[in-house]
Amino acid sequence: MSVIKMTDLDLAGKRVFIRADLNVPVKDGKVTSDARIRATIPTLKLALEKGAKVMVTSHLGRPTEGEFTPEDSLQPVVDYLKNAGFNVRLEQDYLNGVDVKDGEIVVLENVRINKGEKKNDPELGKKYAALCDVFVMDAFGTAHRAQASTYGVAEFAPIACAGPLLAAELDALGKALKEPARPMVAIVGGSKVSTKLEVLNSLSKIADQIIVGGGIANTFIAAAGHNVGKSLYEADLMPVAKELAANTDIPVPVDVRVGLEFSETAAATEKAVNEVKDDESIFDIGDKSAEQLAEIIKNAKTVLWNGPVGVFEFPHFRKGTEIISHAIANSDAFSIAGGGDTLAAIDLFGIADKISYISTGGGAFLEFVEGKVLPAVEILEKRAKN
């Protein structure tokens, strides 16, 4: 994937417009989870070290375009950066130009307040572009959306490049999907086959084995001829599951953990996959299955992980995901993980430092895995050619 990288550019004295992902949760004017800001700080430091005049912006929440309310403001992000030692200020009225002093960071107010942002109005893209000498796209999480601050500005800025976060994300995904070290194992969890169908289809052409979990696994279990009781599954997609299983190595669990109701207090019973009763629901894989899958992961050279294999939020149905998580953490494989539930499992089991790369983009991660072109990356590639 050939894009210009910010790390390769001379930015001394240049006006640099960074599109970051600072869409963080805020409560009572305070940032409650700072992961995205922390991920962006090295990019801001690098731009300052290179002598750039630094502007940074992001979306926050879902404001109505053209209508500003204090809840939509990036002020809590500015306060956070001030506390982190940066010389930083917020600029609300910036579309007709902004002065940036040496060594300061100017945060441009929430882009989604600007009329035309979401529909990628070229006039707005040109206004963003006029603010800078170099546009830096560093928000992988919004790369699957063609908007004025992710696409339009990149079309019209004198130079458009990928920031360190975006470049690292593209490198890691490329390593896992374009030319993976083999065997390559993909783990796809989630409640429905329908929501991950394109992911499964795309991975079936790349992966040597696909491990399915959650409600998705239930559909494969049913397609293999087993009773799934009251489990969440999609009867209409059993033919699709059969076809995928016929053409790809997708191991079906040999044992499962079942409960009589979907609740944190429900008792868990472990049993063979062919012994599930009509009033039971499958909420996790059993120990034998988990150990078999852990062995597959142990022998892998590349692991792509998207989704848990059971209802890990409930302690009684956590063990399958825990065993799989530790197998990935202890593996020598190049591992890449993405998706909200996956990140929650990584946090729960404390294995973040043992995953080779953790993707920051939910929807963008899935679309990349599906083989779709990400508009914000496509325009950077186009600009790199010119």
From Swiss-Prot:
The keyword Cytoplasm applies. GO terms for cellular component: cytosol. Pathway: Carbohydrate degradation; glycolysis; pyruvate from D-glyceraldehyde 3-phosphate: step 2/5. GO terms for biological process: gluconeogenesis; glycolytic process. Keywords: ATP-binding, Cytoplasm, Glycolysis, Kinase, Nucleotide-binding, Transferase. It is found in: Cytoplasm. GO terms for molecular function: ADP binding; ATP binding; phosphoglycerate kinase activity. Substrate binds at D21, L22, N23, R36, H59, L60, G61, R62, R112, R145. Gene3D superfamilies: Phosphoglycerate kinase, N-terminal domain. It catalyses: (2R)-3-phosphoglycerate + ATP = (2R)-3-phospho-glyceroyl phosphate + ADP. Pfam families: PGK. Its EC number is 2.7.2.3. ATP binds at K196, E313, G339, G340, D341, T342. Belongs to the phosphoglycerate kinase family. Monomer. This is Phosphoglycerate kinase. It comes from Haemophilus influenzae (strain 86-028NP). The gene is pgk.
